[in-house]
Amino acid sequence: MKSMIAAILFALVATSLAGYLGYAGYGGPYGGYGAFGFRGVPVGRAVAYSSSIRHPGYGYGLGLGYGGLGYGLGYGGYGGYGLGYGYGGYGLGLGHGLGLGKVW
């Protein structure tokens, strides 16, 4: 149980790190969660992130799972985009986000 909770928290933190690009006029890119578990259940996550009132960042992710391996694509407002990937094991999925954005 502890390992499951730790893995979930890790996934949340990893995907949230990409959101820092939403700061000061960057788009808010987010990658979708990877597959959830060995069955590759598709998991998507909608995220709202804003670190600046004048230039809020936001994005959404779509997850696609297959055989425990999943990929996610995300697009963020104000020119940001991201890619997420994950490997599901022991009924859990870990996701990472990579984001790029442009200044307005």
Curated annotation (Swiss-Prot):
Keywords: Secreted, Signal
Tissue/organ expression: Expressed by the venom gland.
Source domain of life: Eukaryota
Compartment list: Secreted
Recorded GO CC terms: extracellular region
Secretion signal, residue range per the UniProt entry: 1-18
SS bonds (residue pairs): none
Metal-binding keyword on record: no
Assigned protein family: Belongs to the non-disulfide-bridged peptide (NDBP) superfamily.
Protein name in UniProt: Glycine-rich protein
